[in-house]
Amino acid sequence: EGPINGGEYGPYIQSQRKDIYHTVAKYLVSIGRAYPCFCSEDDLSHMREEQEACKDRIGYYGKYAKCRNLSYDEVKEHIDNGDKWVLRLKSMGDFNKKFTFKDLIKGTIELPENDLDQVLIKSDGVPPYAFAHVCDDHFMRVTTVTRDDSYISSVPYHLELWKACGFDAPKFAHLLPLNKKDGDTVRKLSKRKDPEAAVAFYHERGIPVEAVKLYFATLLNSNFDGWFMQNQDKNYNDFMFTFNKMCTSGGSLFDIEKLINISKNYLSRLSAKEVFDNLDNWSKEFDKDFNELINKYKEY
């Protein structure tokens, strides 16, 4: 199911779902939970400078939300003048109040309420990630959101959005990032800087897909290693992955040597024909001379 194969929850490309986002946005306007904002980039820049000078939090909220209480006539005048605008959520939160939510991996987390009037629809009619993801998750019947723990700080805003839209919020499972040793330091694996973050890295090196899956299974649940050592004849799908066995502090360290060892072990259990087929498919794309050689002497 997806943009190629289709399915009952399509369309699957966000640019094709604008009518859905606009319908929800209009609903929020109709119940007084969204409003047009005509602040220019200069206005927002001056706002940030004022907040920095006053040592206030950065963002569009409270007294800094200049367009929050514009009258109908003021809004109409801006629109008649052709002024650019974005649509913002009218937050009902209080940053000085705390709330708790249950994360499936980290347990109970306490956070301040959201009070930022975030952008729902940009001036070009396209929604930012947060609003699109709330709409998509609801209409695609998503029950559990699994994502990087850097999104924990966004939970107050996302939960307020779900509630404002009249949607039931999904459950959350925030995963620790995969880390990499970089000299004397350890940092988060980056899809921009690190080739290991791309699928092509493993494909080009001839590491079988199943071996990569096995390796990441060892990172996903702390007890997978022990289970697999005793069940090497079984498929990793036979293992019952659970949220409570996922890493809750520090994050896992990417270990290429362990991945290579798992790959060797996996290949050693394949038949001669399976090894040849894997090698044939890989060399067709990455080493044509070698491919010609192995096909010339197939009997060996």
Question: Across the structure, where does each feature detected by a protein language model lie?
Answer:
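Non-transmembrane alpha-helical segments in soluble domains
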Residues: 22-29, 213-216
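Active-site cores that bind ATP or allylic diphosphates and position pyrophosphate for catalysis
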Residues: 14, 27-174, 179-191, 198
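Short coil/turn segments at secondary-structure boundaries
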Residues: 8-19, 31
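Catalytic adenosine-cofactor/nucleotide-binding cores of aminoacyl-tRNA synthetases and other
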Residues: 165-300
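Charged, often glycine-rich, active-site loop that binds/positions anionic groups
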Residues: 2, 17, 52
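A glycine-rich helix N-cap at a beta->alpha junction
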Residues: 1-9
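Hydrophobic (often cysteine-bearing) scaffold residues that line and stabilize catalytic clefts
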Residues: 17, 21, 154, 208
